[in-house]
């Protein structure tokens, strides 16, 4: 019987072979566990119109499942808000938390395929860090991912992408994401 080797994601290999050592030299870490890494990626798609038409949530579930390769969790309203005609328990969005190899593959596809496909893309804002090295940004449409068939899109949906790192400061997080290939704008 032959033992098949599991193929490691390209970005994970690059992180382990090059980026980790470069970050250790740059910030002078004494311990290997201090070197920042990406912990998880949370992709969220808000579907506010689903309060009026419950079928719209299915399109968001399908799109997010195609993009991330994982079944999304349907998020429901916690409180009723009369002005928005929203009742407690109505579906208002879908969310996926990616960890491990799926996370590395998603980040690789995001930086090498999806972000360059955005029209008039000038780079990501370097100011959207939260103070402890985590980065959040939004995409206006799901069509930038090649997994989504443009002809089968029922409506354009944006998404929020939250990259959670183990970095202690914004500078460490920025250095990590820049090394991973995130195209930040130069000030």
UniProtKB/Swiss-Prot annotation:
This is Large ribosomal subunit protein uL5. This is one of the proteins that bind and probably mediate the attachment of the 5S RNA into the large ribosomal subunit, where it forms part of the central protuberance. In the 70S ribosome it contacts protein S13 of the 30S subunit (bridge B1b), connecting the 2 subunits; this bridge is implicated in subunit movement. Contacts the P site tRNA; the 5S rRNA and some of its associated proteins might help stabilize positioning of ribosome-bound tRNAs. The keyword Hydrolase does not apply. One of its GO terms (biological process) is translation. InterPro entries: Ribosomal_uL5 (IPR002132), Ribosomal_uL5_bac-type (IPR020930), Ribosomal_uL5_C (IPR031309), Ribosomal_uL5_dom_sf (IPR022803), Ribosomal_uL5_N (IPR031310). Belongs to the universal ribosomal protein uL5 family. It comes from Mycobacterium tuberculosis (strain ATCC 25177 / H37Ra). GO terms for molecular function: rRNA binding; structural constituent of ribosome; tRNA binding. It comes from the Bacteria. Part of the 50S ribosomal subunit; part of the 5S rRNA/L5/L18/L25 subcomplex. Contacts the 5S rRNA and the P site tRNA. Forms a bridge to the 30S subunit in the 70S ribosome. One of its GO terms (cellular component) is ribosome.
